[in-house]
């Protein structure tokens, strides 16, 4: 595995391998067992979209793995002033050992990998959020022990989170249901992918239909970065797509609730449900650290070292 560009590129075995490695790294961290698997290496972190969790978890993770993380904003790169991405990729490949990029267009991530000669990790694009979903899958498996027989349900906008959850959930063997309003479906390429999974995938407009019998309920903000001008209109469109006590009652007893954060209480999730499931949600947030460390090791370390 040379890069993590999108979960569509990974096999089931590769996903499970990353989750197993993340579990191992989490155990070692909790027991003060050092694992400097990237000693002396430098990860360049390109942020064209800001983020608390992505920066802190990658920077901390790289430190714990014995390496160094270098923060690069749009202001630090000539790419923001018109330099072709292929030139940026080739220059950074001479200085760094890996690149993590959080940006708008998936094409930028793909081109960094195409023209560069070092591993590239997708920290988020408008199309997908693979690192977050690997953390989600890790958290789900911690609670339930395996993915067998589970139903995962996403409620809200058919955005990058929905796209990656669909792909990741189906690839590890879960049933996946998604509820979105008309006009806000997941990406067409992802819906095409689901055709190979038959009735293991369901796309609904009724959130209660999607949530029925679910073991995991997941949501995300109604308004993603770059959509701020649509905020008030989206509040009206998504008002019925909220994880609340009524929707939770449609799921299986003891259902897990996840949210990638930041959460807007009273919109996509109620304050009451958020606080009742806060331990699950913040375990999910912690697991970003461990899952991303596993990704960095998988693409940057020598296989013999782990």
Predicted feature locations:
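Positively charged, low-complexity intrinsically disordered leader regions
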Residues: 1-56, 60
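Anion-binding alpha/beta catalytic cores of soluble intermediary-metabolism enzymes, centered on
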Residues: 35, 97-168, 259
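Active-site cofactor/substrate anionic-group-binding motifs, chiefly glycine-
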Residues: 42-43, 47-95
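Glycine-rich phosphate/diphosphate-binding loop of Rossmann-like nucleotide-binding domains
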Residues: 48-60, 142-219
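Short, structured coil segments at secondary-structure junctions
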Residues: 65, 95, 115-116, 172, ...
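Rossmann-like adenosine-cofactor binding region
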Residues: 195-271
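Adenosine-phosphate binding glycine-rich loop
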Residues: 254-255, 261-306
């Amino acid at each position: 595995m040379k890069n993590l560009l999108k979960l569509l590129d990974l096999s089931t075995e590769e996903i499970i391998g990353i989750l197993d490695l993340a579990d191992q790294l989490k155990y070692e961290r909790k027991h003060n067992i050092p694992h400097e698997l990237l000693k002396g290496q430098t990860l360049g972190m390109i942020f064209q979209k800001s983020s608390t969790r992505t920066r802190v978890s990658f920077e901390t993770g790289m430190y714990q793995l014995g390496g160094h993380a270098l923060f690069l904003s749009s202001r630090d790169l000539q790419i923001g002033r018109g330099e072709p991405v292929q030139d940026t990729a080739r220059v950074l490949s001479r200085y760094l050992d890996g690149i993590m990029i959080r940006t708008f267009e998936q094409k930028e991530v793909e081109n960094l990998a195409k023209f560069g000669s070092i591993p590239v990790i997708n920290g988020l694009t408008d199309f997908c959020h693979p690192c977050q979903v690997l953390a989600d899958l890790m958290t789900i498996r911690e609670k339930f022990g395996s993915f067998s027989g589970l139903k995962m349900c996403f409620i809200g906008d058919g955005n990058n989170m929905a796209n990656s959850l669909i792909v990741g959930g189906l690839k590890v063997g879960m049933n996946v249901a998604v509820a979105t309003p008309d006009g806000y479906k997941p990406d067409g390429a992802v819906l095409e992918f689901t055709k190979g999974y038959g009735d293991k995938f369901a796309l609904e407009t009724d959130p209660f239909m999607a949530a029925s019998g679910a073991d995991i309920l997941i949501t995300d903000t109604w308004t993603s970065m770059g959509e701020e001008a649509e905020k008030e209109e989206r509040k009206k469109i998504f008002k019925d797509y909220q994880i609340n006590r009524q929707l939770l009652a449609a799921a299986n007893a003891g259902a897990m609730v996840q949210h990638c954060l930041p959460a807007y209480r009273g919109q996509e999730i109620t304050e009451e449900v958020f606080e009742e499931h806060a331990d699950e949600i913040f375990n999910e947030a912690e697991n970003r650290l461990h899952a991303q460390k596993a990704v960095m090791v998988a693409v940057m370390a020598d296989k013999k070292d782990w």
